[in-house]
């Protein structure tokens, strides 16, 4: 006689009208003195388990009746179809074994404040909505890699510890690195990614990046995941086309693969998808200032376009908008100066609507050795720390462009979330390093 199969909630369709073993956690329980309905979580899905006193007997039934939330159990029973249950199946319990007790689980079904929930993040991840966000994140990661692999981009794993500043020296996490001075947690993989275009033309990286920004806004994390791409021989205009196609493609694929999860989050994706049906407008920084000034904003050339002003522009254009050619002083040393207006650089930020803000920053890179040395000096960065990077401009330098996208902001947009802290399993913010 064959053993009773151990089955996950993911594979129930193969075992209808059979005796099976299900291992999982008590998500909830309700019922009467004659029958109890147990919600059993396994593989991220909830299976309804019917426990009847007539079948189980008084002692086992009382054990079931007094189960606590998040108790881990092994249940044996007959699997039947039930269209009224959450996933179309129901398990009629024959026996149950408690694997691990759950005493006074802190996250009960009642309402809790966000500070409490973030402090209990290691447990909060078990909730239906947080699990749905994790699945959307997973689907986005898959869509990102699929997009690049289908277009002959090569994945390059760039270092987390570096001796070179990629963005702003004021937003670095630093640590002593043996006898070699300071090392920094990478703000970007871009500088290292650029080295690989000379080997494979089109490359990308996807991993954690770190910014020691003293910001407590709903759009900022000190640790976040960024996907970056670099393309040899690509112009600024070609870079914009790639970014738009990339964003539209990965959003559509993620939404398609996350239909049930978005339902759990009560997120209607229709307005989001509608934004993707038209071309993203491209406006110069100078034009953006003119529009903002016409709306009564007190802003002059050289000022930052803050988050509130970004949203004014997305409302003006009815969706995402590229803002290009920012003042050179406001942008990184590696961005190519605009030959038509040396006050600006050939860069662009993609601004998303609905309060999301900038989701992509990209530019054509400076390929000339003398020009980039001059930019390093302007930024008061130690030229000797970039000898390896400058070598790229000595040996077969070519025009090239690239971009970076912060995945947490994109996840927030897809899920309709107000804060990026729920878009990463364990958020790191100014005031939070635990759990």
Swiss-Prot record:
It is found in: Cytoplasm. PANTHER family: ASPARAGINE--TRNA LIGASE, MITOCHONDRIAL-RELATED, ASPARTYL/LYSYL-TRNA SYNTHETASE. Belongs to the class-II aminoacyl-tRNA synthetase family. Disulfide bonds: none annotated. GO terms for biological process: asparaginyl-tRNA aminoacylation. Its EC number is 6.1.1.22. It catalyses: tRNA(Asn) + L-asparagine + ATP = L-asparaginyl-tRNA(Asn) + AMP + diphosphate + H(+). SUPFAM superfamilies: Class II aaRS and biotin synthetases, Nucleic acid-binding proteins. GO terms for cellular component: cytoplasm. InterPro entries: Aa-tRNA-synt_II, aa-tRNA-synth_II, aa-tRNA-synth_II/BPL/LPL, Asn-tRNA-ligase, Asp/Asn-tRNA-synth_IIb, NA-bd_OB-fold, NA-bd_OB_tRNA. It holds the Pfam family tRNA-synt_2. This is Asparagine--tRNA ligase. Keywords: Aminoacyl-tRNA synthetase, ATP-binding, Cytoplasm, Ligase, Nucleotide-binding, Protein biosynthesis. It is an enzyme of class 6 (ligase). The keyword Cell cycle does not apply.
